[in-house]
Amino acid sequence: MIRKFFRLLSILVLCAALFFGYQTLEWSNKYKQGHDEYEKLQAQNTPENESTPENDSDSTKELPFCPDWTALKAENPDIVGWIRMDPTCDYPIMQAQDNDYYLYKGFGRSYNINGSIFLSSVNSSDFSDKNSIVYGHNMRNGDMFGDNDYYYEKSYCLEHPYFWIYRENGQYTYRIFDVMRVTDATEAYDTQFASDDDFETYLNDMKNQSSYTIPDAWPSKTDHIVSLSTCVAAHGSTRMIIQGKLVNITDYSGDDIPLTSLTTQNQNSNATPDSSEQQ
C-alpha cells in the first residue's frame, strides 16, 4: 500500500514538473517573440554606419537617425514618433483612440507581451501639448521602459540627461528635469492647462512630488514637456515617471526648428482629457 502511494506521488510530482516546465517555456517564447518583433524594427531603421551615442551633459545632439517613415506608416499608420533613450530604449511610439489598445499589441497590431510604447489618447499626435504622456511596460528583461529604473539614481541621470523623440519633421531633444515615484492618481498626468500660469503651478506640484530634480534643467511656464510613465513591479497602482523638457528641434538636414512652432500647433489642437488607463 505504501509502495503504491509513493508511486502515485512520484507520478503526480512528475506531472507537476512537466506542467510548470511547459508553462515556463511558453512564457519564455512569448518574451522572445515580443523582443524579436522590435529587434527587427530597430535593425530596419538603424543606419549601418551609426556609432554609439555620446550622451553627455554638454550635448543636445544625438547621432543621425531617421526612421523609414514611409515604410512604417504603410505598415501601421498609428505610429506618431520614435523614442530613443539610454541604455536600451529604441522603439516606435504608437497612438490609438483607446489607451488599452496597445497595452498588449506590438507594432504589427498582433499580440505582443511587451505591448507598445504609446502616446496618450488625449494628447495631440504632434507633441504640441504642454505635457505629452508616453506609456510603456516595465519589462523584467529590460525591454520597453524596463531599464528606466536606472534613472532612480540621480548620478545616472546626470550622465545620461537626454532622450530623443523622432517625428517626420525631425529630432526632438528632451532634457530630463525630474524623476518621481507616484500613484496613478497623481496630477502628473494632467495634459491640458488653462494658461501658462496654471502650467507653472503644475510644475511646482511636480517638484514637490519628485524623488529628485535637476535644477538647471527645470522648465519654465512657456516650455513643453514629455512624461515617460511605467509601472513599478509588485506595486499595482505605483508609477515611475521621468519628465523631460523640450530643448531643441532639428530637421533631418541639421537645421534648427524654432520651439515656438509647437505653440502655434498647440493653438490648433482640440485634444481633451479623459480617464484612460495608465501604465
What feature does the model see in each segment?
Residues 4-23:
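Hydrophobic membrane-insertion alpha-helices, especially the h-region
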Residues 17-279:
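Solvent-exposed, non-transmembrane regions of membrane-associated and secreted proteins
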